[in-house]
Amino acid sequence: MHITLRQLEVFAEVLKSGSTTQASVMLALSQSAVSAALTDLEGQLGVQLFDRVGKRLVVNEHGRLLYPRALALLEQAVEIEQLFREDNGAIRIYASSTIGNYILPAVIARYRHDYPQLPIELSVGNSQDVMQAVLDFRVDIGFIEGPCHSTEIISEPWLEDELVVFAAPTSPLARGPVTLEQLAAAPWILRERGSGTREIVDYLLLSHLPKFEMAMELGNSEAIKHAVRHGLGISCLSRRVIEDQLQAGTLSEVAVPLPRLMRTLWRIHHRQKHLSNALRRFLDYCDPANVPR
């Protein structure tokens, strides 16, 4: 059996795109070359990797079994190439919203000041998206706002972060200490399910309320801040996210009858991920002692 990296690359691209036509475009190969590589791979394995449904290719149980192993081999092949040009490859980072928008930019700025020639790719999504990208080897390192339970991922505590309940300055809740009943009766504007912030808010805060009124779910923190500022409800986000608005007086902190709402931010990478010298150097800049507060 002589399975090639090209065959695995074709297989992975066909699975992602769902057709040999689109895969041929992404790989800059002819459609016949893509089809031949896929047929050869299935022949060597002695199984079909896709079910043919009309003109579509739908991955089956054999393909699902092969896919993570193919990705790992392709990633290792890239790492072999990078061993000889360690400082030339882009560092691929995926961070959840609070971290990617409010913490990492200052870290990356310091790194780029010292190493201006080295590229960095930063993507921002919710914590579930970050974990999936790490599992798929699409990024080198991830930063998330809640715990990760996958056995394929190594999670390391990174920073402590405080969550703050806040309202518009004109809200009655901003005028003094409030009760849990008042919090339960207020309209809440929260991050979407799947975000690390939402998971922690549900656990640390909302679990203490007898009930709560969900007014709105929004997909990013900036939208939540604007909605709260215009009096549409109250919310809970990282102090780092609303610090400027609190100081400017456009938002007000609500004094809740609970201990400080603290959470741990996590750094994650795939268990089989090779940490290159360039990546380790960047992680030195991410040391908690070096991260601006």
Curated annotation (Swiss-Prot):
GO function terms (MF aspect): DNA-binding transcription factor activity; transcription cis-regulatory region binding
Which Pfam family is one of those matched by this entry? LysR_substrate
Q: Which GO terms describe its biological process?
A: DNA-templated transcription; regulation of DNA-templated transcription
Q: Which UniProt keywords apply?
A: DNA-binding, Transcription, Transcription regulation
Reply yes or no: does the keyword DNA-binding apply.
Answer: yes
Segments of the chain annotated as binding DNA: 20-39
**Which residues are in the HTH lysR-type domain?**
1-60
User: Matching SUPFAM superfamilies, A to Z?
Assistant: Periplasmic binding protein-like II, Winged helix' DNA-binding domain
Which InterPro entries does its entry note? LysR_subst-bd, Tscrpt_reg_HTH_LysR, WH-like_DNA-bd_sf, WH_DNA-bd_sf, YeiE
Family under the similarity heading = Belongs to the LysR transcriptional regulatory family.
PANTHER family named among the record's database cross-references = HTH-TYPE TRANSCRIPTIONAL REGULATOR, LYSR FAMILY TRANSCRIPTIONAL REGULATOR
- According to UniProt, the name of this protein is Uncharacterized HTH-type transcriptional regulator YeiE
Q: What is the gene name? A: yeiE
